[in-house]
Structures are given as structure tokens and as C-alpha cells.
Design a protein with these regions (language model features):
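Metal-dependent amide/peptide-bond hydrolase catalytic core
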Residues: 12, 26-180
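Acidic/histidine-rich catalytic neighborhood of metal-dependent amide-processing enzymes
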Residues: 1-26, 91
Length: 180
């Protein structure tokens, strides 16, 4: 565990004292396709259709159980000592991690053409035992991402907006889990 000396949280807590918080990160998945005219979609490679499979996998990752009956084990697995031997108790205290598709973007030459790219944003909440590296790998290992490996890129968003002084300080969109 990290040794936290103090935390000031402006998030409403209903007067409660918190001794931990799930982490958060913002993940981006980009899918490449090939555009063509919508009257002959078989001539292209629809990035939106491929991304639809990724989106379903993200949903499964969030909702599935952790047992062997499913191809994608759900995030609830981190509450089990079998999958998270060092941190399962802290994970149970904080609650399981979650993920959801929060935005979708696409490019296409027109409304009557096959999309040549599609991207999604994933809001990922992390529990004890998860790192940003493990969360990125979890998305890269989804069946649809493996299926379209040559056309998919998984990355973490970066904050790069200028401060009031104009200085740009690039930083990852990642806030680690902490518990004390």
C-alpha cells in the first residue's frame, strides 16, 4: 500500500471520513477501417461494425461473472483471492472496478459511405490490485481487439490543455486507487 499522509477531497461525502478511493482512468480505443460507397459496403471495411464488437466486449467485461463459464471474466474477479491474492480484501472494501463506453466517434466521407475510423472512450474505475498497465492490457486482450489487432490501438488519454499562464503540462488521465 502507498503511505498516504493526508488527503483533502472536495467530493461530497455526506460528512463521512474516507480512508480510500477507487482509481480512475480514461482509455481510448481507435479502430481503422476502409471507406467505400454505402451502396456496396462489401468493398470496404466498416470501422463502426468492428468497434461494435469491442463495445460488447467492454460491456461483458463490466457485467460478466468471474467464473469459467464465460470467455471474458468480469471485473468482479478482483474481489476474489484466486485472481487478486495480495489485494482482494482491500478490493472488497473499495468495491469492484467498473468500465463503460462513455463516448463514440467516427469518420466517414459522407452519410452514405462506410466509416473508415471509429474511436471510443472508456471510463474505467479501478480497485485495489489494478494498475493502469493491467487495465490497458485487459482491453487489448478482449477477443474483438485480438481479432482486429492490426486495426486497433488502445491508449490512455492525456490532459494537455494550457493553464491560465499558457503553459501546457501533459499528464496522463490516470488517478490511482488509494487506501489507508
Amino acid at each position: 500500500r502507498n503511505q498516504v499522509e493526508f488527503v483533502i477531497s472536495t467530493e461530497p461525502t455526506d460528512g463521512g471520513i474516507y480512508r480510500g478511493h477507487r482509481g480512475r482512468m480514461e482509455i481510448r480505443v481507435d479502430m481503422h477501417g476502409v471507406s467505400c460507397h454505402g451502396s456496396a459496403p462489401e468493398r470496404g471495411d466498416n470501422a463502426i461494425h468492428k468497434m461494435a464488437e469491442v463495445i460488447q466486449n467492454v460491456r461483458d467485461l463490466n457485467e460478466n461473472p468471474a467464473d469459467d463459464s464465460v470467455e471474458i471474466k468480469g471485473l468482479v474477479k478482483m474481489l476474489d483471492p484466486k485472481y487478486n491474492p495480495e489485494h482482494w480484501e482491500d478490493a472488497r472494501f473499495l468495491g469492484r472496478g467498473t468500465c463503460t463506453t462513455s463516448q463514440i466517434f467516427y469518420t466517414s466521407p459522407s452519410r452514405c459511405a462506410v466509416a473508415d475510423s471509429c474511436a471510443i472512450s472508456i471510463d474505467r474505475r479501478m480497485t485495489a490490485g489494478e494498475t493502469y498497465q493491467s487495465c490497458l492490457k485487459e482491453i487489448e486482450d478482449l477477443p474483438a481487439c485480438k481479432k482486429y489487432a492490426k486495426d486497433v490501438k488502445v491508449s490512455m488519454y492525456m490532459y494537455d490543455r494550457p493553464a491560465w499562464t499558457g503553459h501546457v503540462y501533459k499528464t496522463e488521465c490516470f488517478f490511482p486507487t488509494w487506501i489507508n
